[in-house]
Regions:
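Beta1/beta-strand and adjacent pyrophosphate-binding region of the FAD-binding site
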Residues: 2-16, 34
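Gly/Ala-rich phosphate-binding loop of Rossmann-like dinucleotide-binding domains
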Residues: 21, 25, 162-164
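Central helical "cap/lid" subdomain
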Residues: 192-234
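Dinucleotide-binding Rossmann-like beta1-alpha1 core, especially the glycine-rich loop
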Residues: 52-131, 138
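Redox-cofactor binding/interface segments in oxidoreductases and associated redox assembly factors
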Residues: 11, 56, 200-201
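Conserved Rossmann-like nucleotide-cofactor binding loop
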Residues: 16, 41, 205
Length: 234
């Protein structure tokens, strides 16, 4: 039973689950951590099927935990990507104003971003906008140079590799679905695991697991599906 006993169990093998596991393992190298993922591979759901945006912290209320967390997280993520040769690009983004009423709001948005520590924010007129994005149809825009994109699936896989390098007793279990749990154990399709500490990073299924823990809440996660199209270059 020793190989099925862990100090901490993390349910969910997406970017949140693996980032949480990596941070814990880095801070406490002797901690024996298990990550449980029901699919055949990590980052199978939202993590591997999104736009890969590195958010800058432009919109959040200055001084709020969310703003500070976003800005600090962006810096840590970019450094981690550089150190580990993860596909990423700090390409910047533009926030488009489609008419004059929206253009007036760009100043406040710029100020908000500057209060959050963003560098290089610039309001663009239509001519400047079209130099960056010739096909944009707005009247003005805010250029946010510190935004970027990253391969989150690759990032998740690197987190997993690092965890096992730090402590070979830690484990990543794929195709291992958590069916039930109590204070001291987890019941899965691969047997029972012993673990007093559990962290749920289960994405769209987090509300269902909360109910299994008898957590009384009126909140319900409603998922929305998006479609991506790959265009042929002309």
């Amino acid at each position: 039973m020793k190989d099925k006993t862990f100090d901490v169990s993390i349910i969910g093998g997406g970017i949140v689950g693996l980032a949480t596991a990596y941070k814990l393992q880095s801070k406490y190298p002797n901690l024996k951590i298990a990550v449980f993922e029901k699919e055949d591979s990590l980052a199978f759901h939202q993590t591997g099927r999104n736009s890969g945006v590195i958010h800058s912290g432009l919109y959040y209320k200055p001084g709020s935990f969310r703003a500070n967390n976003c800005v600090d997280g962006r810096k840590q993520l970019v450094k981690f990507a550089i150190d580990n040769n993860i596909e990423h690009e700090i390409c910047g983004k533009i926030v488009l104003a489609k008419d004059n009423d929206e253009a007036k709001k760009l100043k406040q948005l710029k100020l908000n971003g500057e209060k959050n520590g963003l560098i290089g924010l610039k309001i663009l007129n239509k001519k400047q906008l079209n130099k960056i994005e010739p096909f944009a149809g707005g009247v003005a825009a805010l250029h946010v140079p510190e935004s970027g994109i990253i391969n989150y699936k690759q990032t998740t896989e690197v987190f997993a590799k690092k965890i096992l390098e730090i402590n070979e007793q830690s484990k990543i279990f794929c195709s291992c679905k958590v069916l039930d749990f109590d204070e001291f154990s987890l019941s899965t399709n691969k047997g029972i695991f012993i673990s007093k500490n559990k962290i749920f990073c289960s994405g769209l299924f987090s509300d269902r697991l909360a109910k299994k823990d008898n957590l009384k809440t009126d909140m319900k996660i409603i998922g929305f599906r998006g479609d991506y199209f790959k265009l042929t270059k002309e």
